Structures are given as C-alpha cells and as structure tokens.
Amino acid sequence: MNSQPQARSPFFQRPQIQPPRAAIPNSSPSIRPGVQTPTAVYQANQHIMMVNHLPMPYPVTQGHQYCIPQYRHSGPPYVGPPQQYPVQPPGPGPFYPGPGPGDFANAYGTPFYPSQPVYQSAPIIVPTQQQPPPAKREKKTIRIRDPNQGGKDITEEIMSGGGSRNPTPPIGRPASTPTPPQQLPSQVPEHSPVVYGTVESAHLAASTPVTAASDQKQEEKPKPDPVFQSPSTVLRLVLSGEKKEQAGQMPETAAGEPTPEPPRTSSPTSLPPLARSSLPSPMSAALSSQPLFTAEDKCELPSSKEEDAPPVPSPTSCTAASGPSLTDNSDICKKPCSVAPHDSQLISSTILINEMNGVGEKLSAKENTVGMLRQEVLPLTLELEILEHPQEELKVECTPTPIAPSMLPAFSPAPPTPPTSPPCPPVVLSAAIARSPAVATEVQRVADEGESLRTCLSKDAKEMQDKAESESDGQAEETADPQSLHSGRSPAPVQTATTAPKSWKKTKEQTRTPDEVLEAEAEPKAEEELAVDSVLEPEQEKMSQGFPSERDPSALKRGKAEEGNGEEAEPVRNGAESASEGEGGDGNSGSADSSADGLTFPFKAESWKPADTEGKKQYDREFLLDIQFMPACIQKPEGLPPISDVVLDKINQPRLSMRTLDPRILPRGPDFTPAFADFPRQTPGGRGVPLLNVGPRRSQPGQRREPRKIITVSVKEDVHLRKAENAWKPSQKRDSHADDPESIKTQELFRKVRSILNKLTPQMFNQLMKQVSALTVDTEERLKGVIDLVFEKAIDEPSFSVAYANMCRCLVTLKVPMADKPGNTVNFRKLLLNRCQKEFEKDKADDDVFEKKQKELEAASAPEERTRLHDELEEAKDKARRRSIGNIKFIGELFKLKMLTEAIMHDCVVKLLKNHDEESLECLCRLLTTIGKDLDFEKAKPRMDQYFNQMEKIVKERKTSSRIRFMLQDVIDLRLCNWVSRRADQGPKTIEQIHKEAKIEEQEEQRKVQQLMTKEKRRPGVQRVDEGGWNTVQGAKNSRVLDPSKFLKITKPTIDEKIQLVPKAQLGSWGKGSSGGAKASESDALRSSASSLNRFSPLQPPAPSGSPSATPLEFDSRRALTSRGSMGREKSDKPIPAGTARPNTFLRGSSKDLLDNQSQEEQRREMLETVKQLTGGLDAERASTEADRSKTRELAKSEMCAVPAPDKPALSEEEVERKSKSIIDEFLHINDFKEATQCIEELSAQGPLHVFVKVGVEFTLERSQITRDHMGHLLYQLVQSEKLSKQDFFKGFSETLELADDMAIDIPHIWLYLAELVTPMLKEGGISMRELIVEFSKPLLPVGRAGVLLSEILHLLCRQMSHKKVGALWREADLSWKDFLPEGEDVHHFLLEQKLDFTESEGPCSSEALSKKELSAEELSQRLEKLIMEEKADDERIFDWVEANLDESQMSSPTFLRALMTAVCKAAIIADCSTFRVDTAVIKQRVPILLKYLDSDTEKELQALYALQASIVKLDQPANLLRMFFDCLYDEEVISEDAFYKWESSKDPAEQAGKGVALKSVTAFFTWLREAEEESEDN
C-alpha cells in the first residue's frame, strides 16, 4: 500500500466502501494511494458522538433512525437525505458512487467507536437512501460449507442473502459508494479483530495475508480509515444452514415473526489487530462480488454512526464485526479469511429470522436469546495465517455467522470508525475451534490459499500486532461475539444496531485512551445485558474474564500515531470524559487523536483463559475495573432482599458532561424515541444533554443510573384506540332516521327553536318572534318539543324569564291536532301549563331520590365513597332548588301576562306556604316578589294578610335558617312598602340601558372630580374671615352643619328651636334681614322641603324687606335651582347686589315655585344619581309625606294673592334644561303621565317649555324605541291638554331638526327615531298632518332631507293604521310630494323606492272613505257574516278587511265586537231538524280572530257574551246550546272566568232580554266552574 499520509482528521471515521484502486503493498497500512480523501472520513469540524449506554434501539449513522421489524423503507430515512460527497475512483470501478458515512451532516450522527461491541437493544432503523445496485466484480470465490449439513456447500446461499441497511436491493455495493450499507473486504476499516484468550499474543492480525484481485485492489484504495473499526465490518459469512434460512426465511422476518436473537458465542474470542494489506483476500473478493442477503433478507439497519457498510459481507467484515475492538486501522492487515463452513455451527434459520424480526422485541427477550445462542452456536472460524507468528497455531473464529443488525437488536456494537485504509479481515480466534477439527482444517485451507497473496506486514501492522497482543484476550468476548452475530445476517455494520446513542462528538475531547473507549463501550453493553436473565450470566462471567488485565501503552501510542493518518478523533461520550479527565495520563497524553481501533483485552500469562474451563479464575485490579460496567456488574439480580444499605437498586450515575455541546446535535431519547420526540425522562442536565452517560465515572461513585425500560415500537402495528360506546357525533354523521322525513323536519325545527332561544333578548325580541311565527309546528310531538325547549330554557335562566314568558304569550294561540284523537286539538297554553304543573309537583319525586341517596350515603363506609355520595347529594339538591326557583319565577311571569288565573297562583302560594322546608319557602319568596303586587288588591287582601301572618310566624319561630328568615322578612317589608323594591330587578339590559348607565357613571366620576377641585381653590367673591373662627364640618352626603354661634350678625335674643340653620335655611329664610330666620310655623310648613345644595346661603347679604324675596316661602321654591353641583355653590356663594345683571334668578319667585318644589320632592323618591345631584338626596327629604305636601300647597295657594305673577320666567334656560332632564328621567322610569304633566305645568311658569321639548327629544333620541314611544305620547298629552303649545312643540323639534343631517353621521337611524317621537301626535290627532309636516319640513328642505323624514313617519303610521287610512290622511291634508323633495328628483321614482305610492293612488274622496268606515252594527254584521259564513275567508283576509275598513277605535268598539262574535257563533251553529249543536271546529278555527280583538280584556269579553246571549235569544234559546258555547269558549280560553262571572252578575238593563233563561241553562256550567276553583284552592 502506498505510504502517502492522509490529511489528519480529528475524528474517527466509519468504515466505508472505497473505490477499488491499485494498491501497492506497503508497510504502512494506514496510508493508501489515492487522490481523494475517503468519503467516509469526517472533516475536522465535525463532531463524533459516542452513543449513550442507553439501550437505544438504533445505530446512529445519520441521526436517529428506527429499525422496526417488518418495516421496509424504500424512501429516505427519518432524519433526511444525507449529503453525498462525490468520490471518483481513480481506476475503473464497477460500483456506483453513493453516500458514505462521512457524507452526511454531522448533526445527524457521528461515528461509533468500535473499541468494544455494545449489546444493542432492538434497533429501530429507518433505512438510508437507496443505493444503485453495484456491478459485480470478479473475485475469487470462497466456498463455505456447513458442518451441520454434512459439509454442504452453502456459499451461494450466503452470498445471495446479503442485506443492506439501505432500502436498495442488497446487490454488491460499489467500492466508491461511501454509504454504510455494505463493506467490501478490502474496504473494511481496520476492524480490530477480537482475539480470544486462546492466543495470548495478538499478532494474528499482523501476519494475516490479504489477497485480492488486482482490479479489486485498484478499486479499493480508500485512504486510511479512522482508528476505530466499525463493527459493521463483521464478516458476513453465513454457513449453509444459515444461508438457506436467510434466503428462505428472511421474508418471514419481514412478516414479523420475532424470534429470539442468537446469543453471543459462549466461548470468548478475541481478534488480534490484523495488519492491513493492500491486497484483499480472494475470499474478500468473492464475497464482495456477491451480496450475502437478498433484498428480502435485509432488515434495513443503518447505523447512525456508520454509513458505509459494504453490501457484500466479507471475511474482513465478519472479523471486524466480531471484533470491533479499538485497534488501529493501520495495524490491521487486509488479509483474506477463509471461512470453513464446518468450522462453526451455523445459527439456525429460525433463530436468524427471529433475530431479524426481534428488532422490535424488548431487550430482555433478545438478550435471553443471545445467551442461548452463545451456548448453541459454534463460531464460524476463519483460518488466517499470521506472518509475524506463523509458528503459532491460531484458530480463527468468525463468531456465529454475522447476523443482520436487525437480527441483533440486543447488541449495541461499538461505534464504527470509517476506514481510511483497506481493512484487513479481522480474525476471530476462539476455543471453539479446538472443539471442531473441521474448523481447523478449513482455517488451514483458507490460510494456504492466501499464502500467495500475503504481503509483508507494514510497520503499522506490526505495531498493531503488539498492541493487539495486550488487548485481544480481554476484548474477545466483548467484541467478537456481538460483531460476529451482527455480521452474519446483513452487510449492514453491526454497530448500526447500537443500543444507546453514543454521546455527541466534541472537538475538545479528541484524546481518548483505548481504556476509556473500552469502558465507554462496555457500559452500554452492561446496560443492555441488565435485562438478560440467568441464561446469560455464565456468558457474562466469561466475558468479564475476557477483559484485559493490562494494556500496552505502546499500542495506544501507535494507535494515536495512526490517527494522524486521517483518522478521526475519538468521540467524547457523556460520562466517558470522566475517564479521560480522571485518568489524565491515559486519556489526554499523546496526540490529540487517541486510537482505540484494535484495543483488545489480552489475558496475562498467569491469568485464567476462556479456553481453560477448569482453571482457577484470578483477576487483577485493572481487569476488574474494566468490567465494572458489564451487565452482570451493574444489574441487580432478581430475588435479592431489598436492603438499601447492602444491595443497591441501581449503579452510580456518572456526572453529566459540562462541556458545551454542538447545537446541531439533537438529544437522544430513551428506548426507541427519536431525537425530535419529547422525552419525559429528561436528565437534570437540561436540554441538549443526552439522558444517561455512557462512560463510567469512577470519580463520582455516589451517582446512580436509573434502570431503563425497553419499549418496543412497531410502525406497521395498528394501534387500536378504545372507542366510547356513546361517543358524540356531529349531527351530519349521526345515524338519524334518514328514512323518516318527518323526523328530520322535527329535528330541524327543534334546532331552529334552540337557535332562536339562545339569541332571545329584550332587544331582539320582535325580530326573533317573527322567526318563531314562521316556523311550522303542526304536530303534537313538535309542539311538545317546542314547549319543552322554551320551558327548560326559562327555568335555567330565571333572569330572562320575562322574555320567555312574552314569547309564550305570543304563541298562546298555537294549536295542533292531537295524535291519539285526530278530531281534537291541543293548544300551546294547555301543554305549557301542564308542563309547569308537572315541574311544580316534582318535589315529591325529588324527595324520593334524595332519600335514596341519603340512605346510600349512610350505608357507605369508605371516607372517599361517603365524600363522593355527599357531593352528589348536595349537587342534586342544588340543581333541584335552582329548577324550582326558575319554575316559580316563570309561572309568576306567565301570570302577569294573564296566561294563568289568580286561583292558580293562590293555590301555588298555599302549597308553598304549607311546606316549611327551605326550598318551598325560598320559592314562596320568589313568587311573591314577582306577583305580589298583582295579587294584593283590595278584594284579595284578606287572603294576602293570612299569607303574611303565617310568614311572620315562621320568621319569629326561628326554626329555619337565617337566610330564609331574611328572605321572608324582605318580602314582608316589600309589602309594607307597597311592593316598591329598594333596588331595581337586575334583569337583562338593553344596549341603551348599558350605555346610559355607563354615561351616568362617567358623569358621577366627573362630578366627584369637580367637587375635589372646588374644595382646593378659594371661591372668588366670598369674604372669609379667619378671625371669626368659621368651623365647617363635612357631614354625611355632602351636608354641612354650620355652627350658629359663629354667625356674628345673628343677634336675635330668642331663637326658635325649630329654626333650621342647616342647609334647609336658605335665601328666603334670611330675606327678612338679620331677624334670625323663619318662624316655627313657617319651619313646620317647610320641614318637608329639601335642603338646598347652596349650603352657604346664610352668608348672602340681606335682601330689602320690601322685595318679593322677603316671603318665607320663596327660598323653597328655588331650592333645587340654586345649586347645580359645584358650580351652583360657587354662584350662590357670591353676594348678589341689588343691581345685579340677573336679579330675577334669586330675588323673584311665585307661588308656583312652591308647587314646583313639592313636585321635586316626589321626583326624588326614585331619582337616579343625576336627580340626586339636584336635590341633595337627603333621606329626611325622601321621607316627606303627602300630607306635608298638601299642607304646603294650601299654604302656597293662600299666598298667591299676595305674590304677584312674575313678568319673566324665574329660571334660566340652562336651569330649565336641568330640571327638564330630571322630570323626563323620572317619567321614563315610572311612566306616570299625571305626575309628569303636573311637573311640566309647574315648570311652564318658570321657563320656556320649548327647552323641555328639546331636552326630551335629545334625551330619548338614542334610547330604546319604547322610551321614544312614551315620550311621544307624553308630548301628545301635553299638547292635547294645552299644557304645551304647538309653537313650543315645533320650536323644540326645530333645533334638533336643523342639526339632524350632521347628527346622522353618529346616529344613522335618526330619521326613524324622530318619526317615532312624532307618530303618536299624528296617530292620536293632536296636530294635523299638514301642519306638522309643513313645520317639520322647514329646517330640512335646505338639506334635502324632508322627504326622508316624511317617509319614515308615514311608514310608522302604516304599521299602526292601514295604508288606506294613511293615504287618505295625506290626501286630505292636500300635501304634494313636490313640495318636500329636492328639485329635480323624480317623485314617482321616490315613491316607488320608498313604497309610498299609496299616498298618490286615486280613490274615493276622503269624506266618502270616512263615511264608508262609519258602518252601522247591521252593516258590520252583514259584511262579517258574508266573509265568515259565505266566503269562509281565512283569518288573514278578515284581518285585512277590518284594517282597511275600520280604525282602531272602531275595532275596539262594542258594535264591532258584537258583530264579530255574532258572525262566528252563527257560523258554528249546526241545525238538525229541531235541535241545534255547536260545531267546535269552527270556533277553534276562528279563535285567533276572537283572541286578537278581544285582547284578553274582560270588558270586551263581556260584550262578546252579550252578543252570544242575543244570538241564542233570537233562536228561542235551544236547549244546551248556550252551555255548549260556554264550554267551548272556556276550553279554548277565549273567555276568561272573570268575564263569565261578570256576565252572570251583570244587571245591565239593556242586556236583560232572555237573561234569566240563559242563566238557568248554564247553571251547571257555573257550578262546575266554582267547584273547580274551590278544588284548586283546597289543593
């Protein structure tokens, strides 16, 4: 071989396939001729990773890879395609170039150290890139015979069974291919053969001749490989028996039949480092030409450290695999090894197949298998001739034919080192050869064949021989066995099946002694052998004996020197660095590159040898230290007593590496988890640190290593998740009754109802009710379903019960035919009440459930069970309580909407009051809070008194909880307060309410800020006399108590005790000068008045005695006006001179001021915070009685004659505006038109009322539609009662209309809102349409918006009146659209666009239209009878006719109601000869019409009964006819019980015709009615 040195690489290289080149025999085996650096050589900047001692199931050639049984990849590996470095063979090479281990990014993985084979756990390998099938090379064929089959030639079977770790077919791989899958014998890196103890000197390697064809030499001229040999160089020689099973049964392995792995050979063998020869052996040539495994046989097992295992196994690879010792590649002689088929027992095909399948098995099973195989299998022997020691009889054993890495997942071979020089076939020597003479013969034969090709050993080879002598014995067991096992099955290097990932490569730790490497690799082995049971223990013992007792330092130095020739620096493993650091002389001395290639453990002459089965076993200290991490040494045997002080559960955990890791290197997870997985067992070292360290660290004995679990993962195995029996599915995937369209429609209906209920709010109510009306509810099932949905929603959300009750009120007319009685119908109301009653009476069933649960709780003994049952019981009770309260609240709201009668409600109250349990009493409180005001009228007061007496008794007995007692007391207090709650019901709010509250809160905050600012500054104009000792004390609610003694000018000797110097005394009381204030009589009259916010009014200068302000009442009339927050106080603090610019503000008044004062007291009762600011908010003022107010009014009237009327308003516009806001705010809360009218009447004397109109419009413009409607009605009543003039009305609106166009930016619907404020005025006729429209159009014509407002007004009128009537009003007003639209706009187009064409349609004159509408009772009856009886018009048509021909007043008139009832009754009467009966179907059909116009009004219902009575009288009162009508009308809930009773007791003379006979005919009906009512009361 050429001695040309190669570029030194600081890292170990993996074995690779080098292009064959002409090799010149040379004494320097580490130097090879060639222009290119071997592709497998890693660059200096790449890191080497030592795999942890974890039983990782994958070798790391390219990062994390899985070797999964039955998993055959044809795609790229998990980690990604490796980058290939082109390798151009200098000579003709039939092999295709491919990626080598050095071609892959270092982040994916680093080479392994082959110092010692690591027993790999089940490797999960993801195949690397496919390699093109290499062309066959002519090589010398080696015939292999199987002694177990009578010497049968199994060479062809072995050759055809070669496999590759790559997904490509295992055809011979090109020499130039740098990928790991297969190694040619000449390309095998200097795999240090493991020499067994039979030979103490390890010179075999040096003397082994290597023969090879010349072309192969030329092809295989790889540069010197790293010192560490890849175990992948295991000889891939399989004997006949094995070959057959490999070829035939490897497909079965793919089928997933896991079988135990072949155990390592029982006899320890050690391979001495062989001097590398430039000439490969003929056997290697032959082997390299043929793959050992077929594609089926491959268990893609790419080693993450070695990527260049040649597809064609060679003797060299076998030996190297069997002995992945750390011998220097330079020391290895590339000598061919002949394999004698009969020399060793072949692993049975079943075992091999099972090994292939066992990749995914757990480590324990695999290692058990390994133990068995060791005992069963004779190693395949190769006879090699050692030039150096020819006299020594060496028995070469290629341990049981190399098994594919997939077959040996339990073994983690030592990390491979890429070859840089043609590897020499390692020789496995074992005592097993001695047991088989055939083996010896075959070995001799092979050696003879190689004589012609022998070359002199190079200097390096000799050095390696010396080195191997000292190391071969000890390493034989560790390296030869697993490597041989690995090499047999697959050309993939055995190290591919390494267990734990070796630690990452670190540039700092490039100097590692062979001892460290051996220790580091022994540790993973030991870790993996933990799972091996007693079967392996004898073998472990032998292995422990095979470790070297001493090392040859010269060999180490030679190995280090060898590394200089392109070898990679030894990777540093976590935990192994302790060896290098602790043994500094060993690890850190010499060159930076420490060689461990050929490291073996030689036995001393006096020590026991594995071949000596009877000898005494003796070991020295160093030898024992080397085996301290072997499986037998670190795993706790089963059955030991748990004595923590004597028996350790785990070995000491080595200290983690503190050196910075390469950020490109990903952490390796436990077991089979890939690098990118999330590791639950992260080491304390943090991210990026391998879980457990490989290298032993004797410097930290206190640390222990956790035993790991090997988890088998199978990618192809289908994981079946447990499926829930009643798993939720989307509606589209559910097994619905697809064949039943009715069921589908029903479910769709329920879905829509749920959607509407979820969106139901007071603001969205009208919108959603239209959607509900459009739903089709035509069966009893659907109706019940809808009722259940509404009811459940109502009781679940009591705060929204008002909205749900209103929804039910709108659906009360809904009727559907009964399912069991086709002729009968059932209505919504009846089913709803039944549902409520069922829920109301459910307490008995609930009690039974609670009692049962209570018994279970008492019977339970376990505390956990008792706790669980107790929680369940409490939860059930709480749920039942919430449902009961929700049901009661809902029932109360239904009663308030007249859907339930008083009798039913009294029945509920009595029932709840009888039960003294807390739940019933709580429901009672909720019910009375809801409906107490409606039940507590004059007629029912005696019953209510009984209820409350009983409640007071319950409170006094104190037998219930305090919570319930307080609730009862609250209801009692509520009744005493006339059912006016202290706080408003916290129900759902509209957006307007929320905005309003936020605005009020903001105003309150501003007011507080202003008050604080005012306190800080001096008020100008106020003379402060510090010497006077003014003492101002802050009182509650901003009231200030002034010390009278400080008022120096108050000199009246006798002051009435009732004179109030507190804020109630104001300007008026001091108007008489310094007389001392009001008299006692006056103060009595003024006691009810509120205090002024101007609390410094006593400091005002005295007014002239003759001025109008001298009246003692005048101050009270202005009490709410002198202070407007802090500003008011500032103004009132100023002295008011006689010639002030605004003397009337405080110095003028009238008796109307006093009346206004009293109205303000009433407003304060329920005023919001803004009102409190004006009135001072004193509780004493709120407690003023009506008697005081009436007394004050009388006093004011008596003074009116003495007080002249003011010439000007007493209040400024700003003050009127503030007061108007308070009046409007109170009115909108209590809707008391009478009170509001009185306040406005009083305000009109003090200021312009157009300000009130303007404030009313602005105040309600952005609030709810109901608010605007109420405001519009208030304005109409004020105009109608002439309290508000039309001029003020128009003027108040004009200011807003002028700005409306600009306001439309912020209020887009401003035109609709303005129309809602005006519509009531037009509807009720307060102002004529012409006058109103003309006035409103004036400010809008310049901006062209008059038409838009008129359009909104007319549309709103059409909703409340018919289009026909609105059109008539328009035409009657003689209005033309041209006057209100901008010039040039098409009137016709505008009317069509706004749908106002009805205003222009021709029709009869308004007088004719009005005269037609004024129909007599006879005409109404005729037309209605024609529609109902003759034309049988539907309800909508009747509604349209009534709307078109009658106005609202006529619709509610007795004439129309009687005519309608008469027509319906006539249509329902069926005459059979002389008998009459009622067709209930007709009545039921016309129930919507009757309900709409009777509107649940008792008076209207009474008129309908009068009409029915008259119709019966006309028919001469047929027997039972009236009773049948009464029954039907009652059942259909058209007529209420109150109306029936009222008709019965009616004494109206006009309705007495036939009344006696009629009463007699319905006596039974009334008797039944009363009995039913009494029954409900008793219940």
Curated annotation (Swiss-Prot):
Residues 989-1018, 1154-1176, 1406-1438 form a coiled coil. One of its GO terms (molecular function) is RNA binding. Residues 167-183 have a biased composition (Pro residues). It comes from the Eukaryota. InterPro entries: ARM-type_fold, Initiation_fac_eIF4g_MI, MIF4G-like_typ-3, W2_domain. Residues 1215-1337 form the MI domain. The modification Phosphothreonine is found at residue 168. Keywords: Coiled coil, Initiation factor, Phosphoprotein, Protein biosynthesis, Repeat, RNA-binding, Translation regulation. PANTHER family: EUKARYOTIC TRANSLATION INITIATION FACTOR 4 GAMMA, EUKARYOTIC TRANSLATION INITIATION FACTOR 4 GAMMA 3. This is Eukaryotic translation initiation factor 4 gamma 3.
